[in-house]
Structure formats: structure tokens, C-alpha cells
């Protein structure tokens, strides 16, 4: 299957500037292509992954991805998809974010071998251009009329857009031109909101290098969930690639909780599984939805891709322990991951009677209720039922001197931090 055919089968193509020309080009040779991300934060979220998964597919097909980190454009702010002006960040914050995103990209891509990936920062060539050069060499090639007609600008005319953000499309066009002349990049990939910026780059290259220049643009559809909401958010907000912001367990859970109506689409979009394997899983969704095999495979593939094999095994272990209620085998670090979103209480490390302890923490409303729940077998500590109201809670009951897990009833877990 041709790479373009595969992308279309996966539902990953929204618009192309010249489908026939691009298809012919990738059949004739291995091309260089690029996609950029601005360092507006110190971590990407799963929404950012979508174009870079496409870049990875090109890499696996033998093509040469160039990943651009927008050290320059990140100081300006992309107006695409926004109703208001971005807050400008200091150069120090931008550089911190550049370093963080660079580290994340290095985990996702193989920076060696026959299909080497390059990482570039547009600050390296942009910061040397003075204002006169910018206006004469680049600004002269842009019509205000066409810039105003771009959706990214037109959508902001009523609310207002600064000259800074207005010129963003020129800076991105300069990036494409630079990479075309220096790295032989012929294709830019981006989200559906980047169409205007991409076509600005194509126009600039043809004006400066001649209309015979073979350059192309391709955008990816906006990914929506079956309920019509935008993909990429959980109940707790964005799902980040940084394990400090979204733990591997939470990351795994996001995917494993995918709706049956969405899971096949996500398998096509995000995994590198074959068409045959995805078709098999699609049948399972229809015939055995209760087993949620497709969701488990999706969660495993994505967690392994982003966080690695060890983190995946840990996430699966935590999931199994929570499902069974047998949490004794978990480490303190695994407890911290698995119970991060549970009600959390603070306790000293001094020895205390279980009844007094539960009431003091606020897990139980009264001593009478605490005694009643214990006598009825409704209270478990670290996976074991508490049957004696005279039980003392000591630091020895904890995971590594850090945590105690209380379960009240079948599903009401609480995390108690000792300190």
C-alpha cells in the first residue's frame, strides 16, 4: 500500500494541495517532509501527537522527517484556532519549553538509521534577519488582501488581531522556504487549522524559487469523538505526554476507556497495526464488545509508544490490582500513580486506633458509623478487611512508609499520605 493510500485508509488526510503530484513524487523517491510545533508549553498533549504520528508513518516508509521546534514562532504566537491574542512568553520560558519538547520528540522518533529524522529550531535562522530584510525579502511577497482572506486572520477581524500575530503566517512561510532550500523539504504536514499557513509557504517558495518548485501541503482532519466533542481531553483536562503531568497509568486509562464507536478510528489514526489486525479488532468490537479487546490493544500500543515497555507493564499491573482489589503487590510508586485522582487525606505516622483514625481523617462521619462499618466488613486497609475495632494503625501498615489505602464498601477508595 502506497503511503498516501495508507494515510487515506486511516482517515488521516483532510486537504492536499496536489494529490496526484504528491502521490507521484513519493512513488518516485524518498522525500523530506516537515511538521512544526511551537513551544507554548513544556509538554505536548495527545492532540499534538496526530500530525507527528503521520510523520512517523512516513519515516517507517523510508522517508525523511524534519521536526521543527518553533523557538522563533513560539515567541510570537500562532493565531490559528484562537479567538483572542496569546500571552507572550519570555525568551527564558520559551527556551525551557524548547528543551522539554526536544526531549519528548527524541523519545518518539528514531534519530538514526537509514531514515534519519532531523530536529531543527527556527530561531537558528530567524533571529539573524533584521527588520529591513524581513520587509524587503519576505514581506514584499505577501499581499495584504490575501493575508486578510486567510481563515486564521478573517476569523479574528471582529475581535482584533495584533500585527505580531498577523505576521505569523509570513514567519511560517519563511520556515518552509528555508527547509526547502537547505534540507530539500518538499512537503509540509499540519492540522486542519494550518492550511492557510501551509499555502502561504507554498506561495512564497514559488515566488522566490520559481513556479516549477515541487512543493506540497497536506493537512489532517480535526479529530472528533463520536459525541461530537473534540478529541484529546479527559475529565481531568488535557492528556499530556509528560509523565509528571499525566501518569502512564492515567494515560493508559484514557485509551482503555475509549468508546466502542471511536476505538477503530483511533486504532487507524494512532497505531502502527496492520489493516488485517485492525479489521480483526473491528469484528471483536461488533461481536464481543464486553471484552473490550480493541480498547486494551489501543491502550497498550499507545502507552508503549509514548512511555515505553516498562511503564506499560506498570500501568497494566495497577489496572489489574484496582480491578481485583488485590493491591498488596503494588509498590509505593504504583500506588501514587493509581490513586492520584482518589480522595486524599493526610495523617501523621503516630500509632492510632482504627476507629479514631478514620473519624479524625474524615473518612467516617462518627465513631459509631466507623465501628458499624468495621463490624460489617465494609472497611479494608491495603486490600485486607479490617474485622477488629481494636486494630491499631501503624506505619508498618503503610506502603514504604508513605501511603495507606482505605476502601469503604466495594469501590470507595481513599489514599492516606503519611508525613
Curated annotation (Swiss-Prot):
InterPro entries: aa-tRNA-synth_I_CS (IPR001412), aa-tRNA-synth_Ic (IPR002305), Rossmann-like_a/b/a_fold (IPR014729), S4_RNA-bd (IPR002942), S4_RNA-bd_sf (IPR036986), SYY-like_C (IPR054608), Tyr-tRNA-ligase (IPR002307), Tyr-tRNA-ligase_bac-type (IPR024088)
Cellular localization per UniProt: Cytoplasm
Motif mapping: 'KMSKS' region: 230-234
Binding site for ATP: 233
UniProt entry tagged with the keyword Hydrolase: no
Enzyme class: ligase
Residue ranges occupied by any S4 RNA-binding domain in the UniProt entry: 352-418
Function noted in UniProt: Catalyzes the attachment of tyrosine to tRNA(Tyr) in a two-step reaction: tyrosine is first activated by ATP to form Tyr-AMP and then transferred to the acceptor end of tRNA(Tyr).
Subunit structure: Homodimer.
HAMAP family reported in the protein's UniProt record: Tyr_tRNA_synth_type1 (MF_02006)
Name by which UniProt lists this protein: Tyrosine--tRNA ligase 2
Protein source organism: Bacillus anthracis
Gene: tyrS2
